[in-house]
Amino acid sequence: MSDIRDIQPQSCFYHSRGLRLHYLDWGNIGAPVLILLHGGLEHARVWDQLARQLCSDWHVVVPDLRGHGDSEWSGGGAYSIVDMVPDLAALLAELGDPVIHLVGHSLGGNVAIHYTALFPQRVARLCVIEGLGFSPEARARRDRRSRLEQLRQWVEKAREVDLRRPRGYASIAEAVARLREHDPLLSPELASQVCEHGMRINERGLWQWKYDPRVRASGPSEVASPEPSDLWRAITCPVLLMYGARSWASDPEQDGRMVHFTSARRVLIEDAGHNLHHHRPEEFLTHLQAFLHGSD
C-alpha cells in the first residue's frame, strides 16, 4: 500500500498583470476544483499535509500569492488585497473558469472573500479561516488617527521595509526554532516543512524567507478603509468561518460581523490559534470535509 506522503503535486506557472506566478496542482483533473489560499508571509506548501488528504475527492490547486513562495515579486510593491484578486481570477481562467470550492486563511481568506463577493456565481462554497480583516474594535482604534496620519505612517513603514535588510539564518534548523518560538502550537514536522520549502540562500550565504519583505507594508487602499460589509452581503453561497479559541482574532459571532452574511456558520476550534488548520489539522479537516460535501 502506498504512503499518502508519497503523493506529490505538479509545479505550474501562469501569468497575471505582468507577473509570473506559481501554483501547485495536486491532480485528479475532472473532479470538482478546490482552491486553497495561504496566509501572509507563507507559501503554497504549507497546505501539503491537508492537500494530500483532500486530493482523492477534489482537484486541489494551491497558488503562491504574488510576492510569496515561488511566485514573482511585484516590482512596485503592489500587495494589497485588491491586487491579489485579479491573480486569482487569472488562475481560474488558466483552469478553464470552473465553479470552485474556495478555502482561504488570513490574507488568503480576505482575498477569497473579495473574489466570492465579486463573482458569486463562480464559488459553490467558501471556507474562511480568520480572514475577515479588522474587527470593529480594531477598526475603531485605527480610525482614532486621521486619514492623513494613517497615510503618513504607511509611507514611513513602506520606507522602513525598503531599507531594512531581511533577517538571515545560519541554518534551516535555526529558522525552525525561531518559527516554533513564534508559534509554539506548530508541530516540529510542519515547522520544518514550512521552512524547507519557504526559504532560500541569499547573497550572504544565509537562509532567508522567499517572500518579498514589502508584503509587510499593506497597500494604501486599506488606509482608513470602511468595514467591507457590502462584500459580505454580496456573497450568496454557504460560508464556513473558522476561528481558533486561543487566537488573537476577534470572534465574528461575538463582534457582530456574522449578521452581514446571508448563509454563514462559525466554528471555534479549541487549543488552536490563528493557524488553527496547522495546530489541529485532523479536527479542521473533519469540519472542512463535512462543509465541502454539504453534510455539515
Residue ranges and their predicted role:
Residues R17, Q49, V61-L107, L118-F119, ...:
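Active-site loop/oxyanion-hole signature of alpha/beta-hydrolase fold enzymes
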Residues V111-Y115:
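Hydrolases whose catalytic domains are alpha/beta-hydrolase-1, hotdog thioesterase
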Residues P166-A245:
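Alpha/beta-hydrolase
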Residues A272-L285:
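Catalytic histidine-centered segment of alpha/beta-hydrolase-like enzymes
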